[in-house]
Amino acid sequence: MRYLIAAAVLAAGAFVVAPGWAAGAEPPSCASLGGTVEAGQMCQVHVTGPTYMLNMSFPADYPDEQALVDYIAQNRDGFVNVAQGSGTRDQPYQMEATTEQHTAGQPPHNTRSVVLKFFQDLGGSRPTTWYKAFNYNLGTKQPITFDNLFAPGTTPLDSIFPIVQRDLNRQNPLGAVILPSTGLDPSHYQNFAITDDQLIFYFAPGEMLPSFGGPTQAQVPRSAIPPLAV
């Protein structure tokens, strides 16, 4: 099952990861970020400053919520710090995000995927876009990463890479070549979502194709790759 949730987010500065939370500090939450939980259990955060606007929308009921909120809060803090330390300009610094969610399987052996997409305008020559995916096995109550997505000893990228290459080439009119050194590198497949019949991989500009191609995603049928270990 697939459902998309558009989420306007952060307008303002730069992507900087803040240091870890101080000992004894209250961990971040929707409320601590200044947000409210609205329809669909989505946390909505809207903040403006003299040099920026910040709007965030993310699920407030994700089973590994603290990991998701920590990531958002760290990026929010870094963004605000840079925006507040920068001079004013004609347009405010902007960061926007969307949330895409997917589920797969049937309880108790089901999974949930949340993919955050961030757009950031720092006033440079071109904005920045990146993805951050969170996947969770509701049966084992454990996060899912690419490292534990398949059984040990399998080589899933041998099957995944050719499918990703064909799908991305179909989307790219210039037909850019993806080198095997890139296409077979697991570090490029960390952001994914799981559905009943496919894996969806998300790539930042320049990760698989040239930066001018923008962010991309590729759909890989589960029937064409080794079984998932979930």
Ranges and model annotations:
Residues 2-6, 19-230:
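Compositionally biased intrinsically disordered regions enriched in Thr/Gly
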Residues 6-11, 15:
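Hydrophobic helical h-region of N-terminal Sec-dependent signal peptides
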